[in-house]
């Protein structure tokens, strides 16, 4: 047969403790070792999710390791982490962009919305630290009363 190597970086694992733990792809340490300064780490805390607040399950964190706009790993500690990691497994398996995850529409209010918000958090610093955006905002502020 032909030599082949199975791709396994998109296979998630979960530990059903309290809180649940889940991981797919590279951990932060592995991503930092492989990608160095190209790595961005995005964090989103459950305490900013309305469903988590309503259910009093606000202890939790999702962390996504991103290189050049694409996730290379995700770690989740919190309520339903084993369910939430599925989206990131799909993202890694299909090499999806963070913009595609951020553009997804989730029912409101759901815990699953933390995935979308984590993806959206990737763009915050990019947008507000951009010199181009700063120049445009400065121009608009001078023109508008």
Feature roles, as predicted:
Residues 1:
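Glycine-/small-residue-rich beta-strand-loop submotif within the FAD-binding core of flavoenzymes
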């Amino acid at each position: 047969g032909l030599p082949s190597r199975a791709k396994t970086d998109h296979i998630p694992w979960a530990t059903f403790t309290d809180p649940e733990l889940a991981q797919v792809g590279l951990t932060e340490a592995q991503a930092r070792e492989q990608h160095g300064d190209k790595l961005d780490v995005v964090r989103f805390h459950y305490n900013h999710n309305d469903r988590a607040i309503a259910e009093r399950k606000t202890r939790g964190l999702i962390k996504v390791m991103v290189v050049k706009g694409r996730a290379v790993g995700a770690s989740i500690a919190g309520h339903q982490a084993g369910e939430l990691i599925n989206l990131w497994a799909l993202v890694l398996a299909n090499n999806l962009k963070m913009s595609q995850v951020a553009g997804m529409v989730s029912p409101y209010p759901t815990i699953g919305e933390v995935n979308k918000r984590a993806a959206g958090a990737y763009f915050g610093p990019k947008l507000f630290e951009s010199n181009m955006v700063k120049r445009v905002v400065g121009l608009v502020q001078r023109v508008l009363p």
